[in-house]
């Protein structure tokens, strides 16, 4: 924009040079100034703290003062022009303090910085400037403008200081705890997300390059970094200091390619789902052992870029906004979810199948929006009108085009996304859609020009006519998208978050472990903003692996005391106790030592063994004290895969937890935790978050209730799932083997929670918008009702079961939350059958069976290529219908006769269709 304003008769060469200069300036800010300020500020901090012995953040304060003084000095000198040498020195000093020359890491960054600073000083020196031609000289105005620009950028970025200030205040929510210049740098650099190759790098099957060193085969490091963390003090008198620890290590790969798009070894099946990968074999030297490695070809790599990253993850979103959207269900490439449509039948039928035969739940989806490509056509007209509107129009076109490109396709290139993203990413490209919307607006002017040129209309009548007609386009868009953007009357996030907290015991300052965003942030919101259940503590297991989060858990928050963690910070600081090996094979040796000491009759020998390993080496508190937290390196393991926890029976009785009826009043003396993964295989190590859970189990003594959100996966449950008792949206830790005792649900508490305490965010209101994420939580709530009802039926509490069924139907109605196999609808129908409520049961089963038939009918209407990729979904629905039919027949429902014939008919059509496509 600046170039075109200054040079009215700009040419292509000048435009490209201006674009290049713009890119250099952006790179200088993003990769020079932003990390450079952190880098130079870090050097000041290290010097003042480690060398001069001053307190934390003193060096940063000095740096800020020096940087501000340097900028002011430079602006003053370049404005007054009294002394050219001082002007050059002040400018170079400012650039150096901003860290722009120090690109890279470690020693190389310093060397590069010194070279750049020396060159810059030499170039700007008065003698050199005087000897140059006029066009190569740098004027004082240029230096002054540059310094003013950097000053404004620094002032803007100074807002990040609030992050450090807030973190230093130790607020209850303090992500990453960036309390100094080094942790702030990690925070700004998003280092927890890792890196990905962009222009050159590995493929998903590439192997790390190896070399033989000192007789060992080791991976070759491409580059490594170090970082500084605060040293933990061993005494209050010790001075503040930082210690250097290893940072991120990147390894060199033996097989690399240009523009690598398929690079993640964790997404190989997904890559192969998008591209038919044959690959080619390349030799790989495995320290003398030659093997062949199959990597994708460059063309296969490019095909994935176009098919997935560009088409599916950009143009699909683009068409959502300017052509139409199939529905708001997240798609992974399947034909029925998340695609773009137009509203024009013959186009849509060719793209995504016969839309008139769509299952009713897809037809009724509020995210089903059709624009008939009218915004797209207007945008294309505006694009061409601007591009062919004289020299000024061409210049404006390139400005809008680069805005469109840099906020759209350039982001696609930079993100290098893997398949199976956790959510739709259309928000990342909003700037690009805004840019195209400029062309949409210009399309009105383009149509006016067409009418004037070809219909010979006067300007005013043409403008009135076109404006009136084109106004219908945004009206159509608003009419289509209003219902799926209207959140009025919906309080799901607040209420469902409260339901998690309401599932917890009202006394005892309970703890609830969560893991994902949707079962954590609503709870934090309720505690932070609504002041709801501030006596409880929400603990996110994915953060519990970090030292900064453990710090927060050890502090009181709101009305909740600290969590029962007794470890000193030096024991869990980053790099310490990240994991502890499980070594059950040493159990025999330990048992032999105990037996030998016991049989020796020597009390001193037995006492020595107890002093070394504890009285019971496999009991949790002993393991924590004598093994995990031991100073002796050889004992820094877990010596068993079955941890024993002694049970304080009186504490259990005081705790308020339900004692299984099968036990009567008897409580076991101990419980065992089997250290297994979610597949039942023995674990080989426990990570820091799991160690913290064990620490809390050991110290809470059952008197402080501990819960696991039901949405946390088994892999994060520490093998405690056999001991859980569900009380709502959370399961309570107990010392009882509840699965064996048939006591996995406390029906009394759960009934009270669901029927009297839970709120449902307005999802019972007809017509309320429920998007996919909210629908998942609605499914969870219906499943919880189904679990409660099943337990009540087992206990013979039929009146309560019927009341819960009817209440679930009222609060989670099918007109907003359709019946589905995944949300407990089948279990509810069976309960209705068992209670003699055949009509209500038939209503649910009829909806489920009809839904399966609608999907299968639609799949059968697809063309061969579309049907081929949908066969798995067809088989899924036919299996569901078969199970539904069995349930109908079991309870002698009249529906079974009708659906039995339809099942046979559809299966026959499927068999003939499959044979025909082979």
Residue ranges and their predicted role:
Residues 1-429, 436-509, 521-918:
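ER/secretory pathway lumenal C-terminal domains and tails of membrane proteins involved
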């Amino acid at each position: 924009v600046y170039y075109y304003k200054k040079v009215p008769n700009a040419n292509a060469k000048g435009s490209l040079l201006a674009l290049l200069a713009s890119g250099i300036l952006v790179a200088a800010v993003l990769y020079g100034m932003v990390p450079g300020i952190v880098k130079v500020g870090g050097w000041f901090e290290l010097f003042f703290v480690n060398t001069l012995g001053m307190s934390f953040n003193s060096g940063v304060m000095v740096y800020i003062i020096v940087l501000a003084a340097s900028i002011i000095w430079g602006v003053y000198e370049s404005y007054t022009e009294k002394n050219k040498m001082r002007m050059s020195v002040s400018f170079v000093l400012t650039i150096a303090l901003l860290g722009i020359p120090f690109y890279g890491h470690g020693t190389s960054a310093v060397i590069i910085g010194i070279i750049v600073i020396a060159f810059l000083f030499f170039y700007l020196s008065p003698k050199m400037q005087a000897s140059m031609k006029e066009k190569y000289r740098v004027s004082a105005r240029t230096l002054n403008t540059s310094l003013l620009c950097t000053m404004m950028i620094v002032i803007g970025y100074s807002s990040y200081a609030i992050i450090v200030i807030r973190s230093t205040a130790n607020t209850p929510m303090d992500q990453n705890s960036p309390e100094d210049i080094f942790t702030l740098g990690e925070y700004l650099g998003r280092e927890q997300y890792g890196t990905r190759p962009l222009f050159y790098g590995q493929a998903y099957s590439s192997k790390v390059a190896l070399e033989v060193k000192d007789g060992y085969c080791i991976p070759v490091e491409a580059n490594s970094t170090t970082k500084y963390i605060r040293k933990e003090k061993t005494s209050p008198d010790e001075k503040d200091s930082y210690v250097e620890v290893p940072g991120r290590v990147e390894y060199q790969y033996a097989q690399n390619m240009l523009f690598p798009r398929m690079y993640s070894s964790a997404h190989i099946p997904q890559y192969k789902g998008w591209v038919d990968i044959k690959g080619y074999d390349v030799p790989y030297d495995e320290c003398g052992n030659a093997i062949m490695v199959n990597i994708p070809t460059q063309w296969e790599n490019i095909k994935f870029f176009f098919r997935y990253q560009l088409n599916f993850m950009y143009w699909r979103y683009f068409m959502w906004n300017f052509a139409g959207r199939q529905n708001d269900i997240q798609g992974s490439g399947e034909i029925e979810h998340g695609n773009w449509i137009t509203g024009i039948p013959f186009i849509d039928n060719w793209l995504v199948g016969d839309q008139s035969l769509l299952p009713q739940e897809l037809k009724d989806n509020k995210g089903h929006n059709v624009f008939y490509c009218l915004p797209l056509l207007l945008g294309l007209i505006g694009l061409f009108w601007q591009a062919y509107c004289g020299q000024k129009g061409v210049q404006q076109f390139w400005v809008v085009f680069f805005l469109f490109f840099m906020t759209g396709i350039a982001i696609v290139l930079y993100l290098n996304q893997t398949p199976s993203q956790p959510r739709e990413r259309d928000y990342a490209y909003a700037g690009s859609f805004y840019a195209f919307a400029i062309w949409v607006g210009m399309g009105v002017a383009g149509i006016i020009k067409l009418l004037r040129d070809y219909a010979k209309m006067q300007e005013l009548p043409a403008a009135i006519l076109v404006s009136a007609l084109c106004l219908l386009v945004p009206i159509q868009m608003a009419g289509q998208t209003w219902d799926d953007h209207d959140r009025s009357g919906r309080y799901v996030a607040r209420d469902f978050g409260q339901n998690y907290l309401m599932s917890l015991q009202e006394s005892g300052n309970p703890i609830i472990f969560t893991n994902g965003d949707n079962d954590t942030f609503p709870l934090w919101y309720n505690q932070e903003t609504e002041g709801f259940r501030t006596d409880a503590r929400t603990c996110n297991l994915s953060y519990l692996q970090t030292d900064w989060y453990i710090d927060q858990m050890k502090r009181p928050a709101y009305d909740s005391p600290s969590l029962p963690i007794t470890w000193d910070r030096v024991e869990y600081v980053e790099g310490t106790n990240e994991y502890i090996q499980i070594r059950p094979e040493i159990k025999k040796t330990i048992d032999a030592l105990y037996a030998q000491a016991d049989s020796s009759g020597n009390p001193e020998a037995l006492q020595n063994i107890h002093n070394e390993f504890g009285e019971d080496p496999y009991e949790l508190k002993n393991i924590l004290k004598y093994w995990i937290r031991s100073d002796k390196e050889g004992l820094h393991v877990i010596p068993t895969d079955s941890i024993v926890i002694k049970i304080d029976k009186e504490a259990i009785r005081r705790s308020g937890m339900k004692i299984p009826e099968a036990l009567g009043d008897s409580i076991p003396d101990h419980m065992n935790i089997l250290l297994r993964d979610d597949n039942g295989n023995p674990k080989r190590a426990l990570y820091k978050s799991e160690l913290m859970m064990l620490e809390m189990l050991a110290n809470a003594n059952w008197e402080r209730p501990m819960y696991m959100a039901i949405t946390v996966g088994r892999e994060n449950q520490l093998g405690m799932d056999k001991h859980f008792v569900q009380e709502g949206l959370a399961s309570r830790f107990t010392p009882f083997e509840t699965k064996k005792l048939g006591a996995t649900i406390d029906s009394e508490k759960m009934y009270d929670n669901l029927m009297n305490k839970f709120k449902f965010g307005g999802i019972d209101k007809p017509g309320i918008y429920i998007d996919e994420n909210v629908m998942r939580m609605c499914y969870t709530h219906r499943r919880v009702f189904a679990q409660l009802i099943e337990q009540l039926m087992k206990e013979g509490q039929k009146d309560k079961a019927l009341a819960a069924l009817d209440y679930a139907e009222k609060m989670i109605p099918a007109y907003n939350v359709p019946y589905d196999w995944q949300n407990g609808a089948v279990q509810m129908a069976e309960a209705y059958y068992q209670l003699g409520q055949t009509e209500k049961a038939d209503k649910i089963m009829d909806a489920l069976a009809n839904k399966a038939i609608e999907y299968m009918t639609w799949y059968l209407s697809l063309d061969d290529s579309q049907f081929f990729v949908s066969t798995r979904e067809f088989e899924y629905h036919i299996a569901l219908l078969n199970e539904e039919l069995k349930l109908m027949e079991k309870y002698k429902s009249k529906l079974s006769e009708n659906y039995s014939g339809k099942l046979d008919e559809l299966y026959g059509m499927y068999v003939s269709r499959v044979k025909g496509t082979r």
